[in-house]
Structures are given as C-alpha cells and as structure tokens.
C-alpha cells in the first residue's frame, strides 16, 4: 500500500503523505 501511495503522490495527486 505504501508503494501505491508513493506512485499516486508522484503522479501529482498528492492527497496523502507517505506513511
């Protein structure tokens, strides 16, 4: 899940910080 969050953040949808 952490990896997914990182990908999402890199896409530009910085909705949640990397926990």
From Swiss-Prot:
One of its GO terms (cellular component) is cytoplasm. Residues 1-19 form the HPr domain. The active site is at residue 14. Disulfide bonds: none annotated. One of its GO terms (biological process) is phosphoenolpyruvate-dependent sugar phosphotransferase system. Its main location: cytoplasm. It is found in: Cytoplasm. Keywords: Cytoplasm, Phosphotransferase system, Sugar transport, Transcription, Transcription regulation, Transport. Belongs to the HPr family. General (non sugar-specific) component of the phosphoenolpyruvate-dependent sugar phosphotransferase system (sugar PTS). This major carbohydrate active-transport system catalyzes the phosphorylation of incoming sugar substrates concomitantly with their translocation across the cell membrane. The phosphoryl group from phosphoenolpyruvate (PEP) is transferred to the phosphoryl carrier protein HPr by enzyme I. Phospho-HPr then transfers it to the PTS EIIA domain. This is Phosphocarrier protein HPr. The gene is ptsH.
